Curated annotation (Swiss-Prot):
Keyword vocabulary terms for this entry: Calcium, Disulfide bond, Glycoprotein, Lectin, Metal-binding, Secreted, Signal
Domain C-type lectin: 33-155
Amino acids binding Ca(2+): Q119, D121, E127, N142, D143
Similarity comment: Belongs to the true venom lectin family.
Protein name per UniProt: C-type lectin BfL-1
Length: 158
């Protein structure tokens, strides 16, 4: 009797733990995180072309938004694993009004901005899109010309 009780309790615990788990499946080679799927692409595109490339996967896909230092650390490791020496990486943040008002393409809140020292600067009044900088270990951000060609990080909800 004790053996069956133990098995029953184990099955109940397994069921309860699984019922609270997120139910989404990312495509192969995409990183699952917080109910979204992320993928870094080594193709070099302008910021706008990268955003359009992300959107082609399905409605709701965009260049990635990052909201915490924990996110930044995890993505820096992910990007470093896939890109070696390929430069900075576009993310979904830009200054559409050109007044230092930074907005995510997915319209999520702008609550985390780990800028490099003396950034953003809108250098030559020509830098309004945001990249993760490779020589900071992909941990800090810089504003750059949106026409620059960069690898990029997409996010999708699957």
């Amino acid at each position: 009797m004790g053996h069956f009780t133990f098995i029953g309790l184990c099955l109940l615990a397994m069921f309860l733990s699984l019922s609270g788990a997120e139910c989404y499946t990312c495509p192969i080679d995409w990183l699952p995180k917080n109910g979204l799927c992320y993928k870094v692409f080594s193709k070099h595109k302008t910021w706008f072309d990268a955003e359009m490339y992300c959107r082609k996967f399905k409605p709701g896909c965009h260049l990635a938004s990052l909201h915490s230092n924990a996110d930044a650390v995890e993505f820096s490791e992910y990007i470093s694993d896939y890109l070696t020496g390929q430069g900075h990486v576009w993310i979904g943040l830009r200054d559409t009004k050109k007044k230092y008002i930074w907005e995510w393409t997915d319209r999520s809140r702008t609550d985390f901005l780990p800028w490099r020292k003396k950034q953003p600067d809108h250098f030559n009044n020509n830098e309004f899109c945001v990249e993760i900088v490779n020589f900071t270990g992909y941990l800090q951000w810089n504003d750059d010309n949106c026409a620059a060609l960069r690898p990029f990080l997409c996010q999708c909800k699957y």
